[in-house]
Amino acid sequence: MKITIQHIDLFPTRIWLFDLSGLSEHYPVWQSALDQLRRENPTAAGRSNRNGWNSDKIIAANPLFASLVEAANQAFIHALLQTDPNVNYSFKLELWANIHDQGGYNMFHVHQNVLL
């Protein structure tokens, strides 16, 4: 029996990688802030995190994370311009923290109505 095999690239996926190691000086401050936030709000916000904790979507509003927010905005602008440089995209970041305890993970899920 002869089997003909071919492939069609219908769903190409580009993955952008951004090196944020330049922000590493902020990591200890961010970790302390998130640990404090978890102590103050021990009940996880829910969503897909299992065996751990996640915050509400409040991280972007915290001035301690301003450099991370700026880097994320720049990254999304870069990606969106590669998608189509002739479109003036508008977006708003929602940032939250996921902290996984030993054995923790995120459930498989999708984000409806998102571009990237």
Name each model feature, range by range.
Residues E94-L116:
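Catalytic core of non-heme Fe(II) oxygenases with the double-stranded beta-helix
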Residues D84-L95:
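A short coil-to-beta-strand element that immediately follows conserved catalytic motifs
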Residues L10, V87-Y89, H109-V114:
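A generic structural micro-feature
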Residues M1-P85, Y105:
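Non-heme Fe(II)/2-oxoglutarate
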